[in-house]
Amino acid sequence: MKIHKGDMVLVISGPDKGAKGKVIQAFPKTEKVLVEGVNRIKKHVANSAPERGAESGGIVTQEAPIHVSNVMVLDSDGNPTRVGYRFDENGKKVRISRRNGKDI
């Protein structure tokens, strides 16, 4: 998967179109990412199950995963770009911006 934890992304489709955020977590098996402040849902949590900030249960607002096809990585200039790969001088695979050719 070309999007990793810590990347800044732009949402390109869906209700949150145009929103920018940082990837909190990536799920390669399902090809989904968790983006900070995007796709917020309200989850009802039981009193006995403390989870993600809910100390005593109730209704918790949290981010839900979004498919990677609905986001684009932002390059160093802050522009949305597709991700490519190249090998550096040590033979290590690095991600590059397709827009300007710089490393991500």
Swiss-Prot record:
By its UniProt entry, which Pfam families does this protein fall under?
KOW, ribosomal_L24
Answer whether the UniProt record assigns the keyword Ribosomal protein to this protein: yes
List the taxonomic lineage: Bacteria, Bacillati, Actinomycetota, Actinomycetes, Mycobacteriales
Q: GO CC terms for this protein?
A: ribonucleoprotein complex; ribosome
Q: Which gene encodes it?
A: rplX
Indicate the quaternary assembly: Part of the 50S ribosomal subunit.
> Which species is listed as the source?
Corynebacterium diphtheriae (strain ATCC 700971 / NCTC 13129 / Biotype gravis)
Origin, by domain of life? Bacteria
Q: Which UniProt keywords apply?
A: Ribonucleoprotein, Ribosomal protein, RNA-binding, rRNA-binding
PROSITE patterns documented for this protein: RIBOSOMAL_L24
Q: Which family does it belong to?
A: Belongs to the universal ribosomal protein uL24 family.
Q: What terms describe the molecular function in GO for this protein?
A: rRNA binding; structural constituent of ribosome
Question: What are the BP-aspect GO terms?
Answer: translation
- Protein name, please? Large ribosomal subunit protein uL24
PANTHER family, per database record: MITOCHONDRIAL RIBOSOMAL PROTEIN L24 (PTHR12903)
**Role, per record:** One of two assembly initiator proteins, it binds directly to the 5'-end of the 23S rRNA, where it nucleates assembly of the 50S subunit.
